[in-house]
Amino acid sequence: MSYIQKRGQNTAWRTALMRNLTTELIINESLEVTQTRAKELRRHFDHMITLAKRGDLHSRRQAASWLRDIDADKKETALQKLFNKLAKKYENRNGGYTSILKLDNRKGDNAPMVIIKLI
C-alpha cells in the first residue's frame, strides 16, 4: 500500500510487525499505534475476519499461519477467539470491522497516534 513505508526495515520485519499487531488486536480488541501502522493493520485484520466468517478448514489453516499462537485468555487462543466469537459478531457485516480514532501526537517524535478498535 502507498501509505506503508519501509522506514529502513526489510519485508520480514514489516510482516512480523503486522502479524503481532493483528494478533494483539484480536486479543485486546483495541490498540494504540501510529496512524500509518493502524491503516495497514486494518487491511490485515479485515482479511482475518473474512477468513473467520468463511469458517472452513482451509480458512482456519490460513489464519493459523498468520496469527501468533498466543492465549487470548485462560480458555482459548487468539485463533479460537477469532473463529468462535468475532466471526459470529460480524457475520452480518460486510466490512469495516474497525474504527480509527485520532489522538494527540506522540511526545517524543511527534508521530500521529491513533486508537484502532473493533466496532
Curated annotation (Swiss-Prot):
Keywords: Ribonucleoprotein, Ribosomal protein. Pfam families: Ribosomal_L17. Disulfide bonds: none annotated. GO terms for biological process: translation. GO terms for molecular function: structural constituent of ribosome. One of its GO terms (cellular component) is cytosolic large ribosomal subunit. InterPro entries: Ribosomal_bL17, Ribosomal_bL17_CS, Ribosomal_bL17_sf. HAMAP family: Ribosomal_bL17. Part of the 50S ribosomal subunit. Contacts protein L32. Belongs to the bacterial ribosomal protein bL17 family. This is Large ribosomal subunit protein bL17. It comes from Mycoplasma mycoides subsp. mycoides SC (strain CCUG 32753 / NCTC 10114 / PG1).
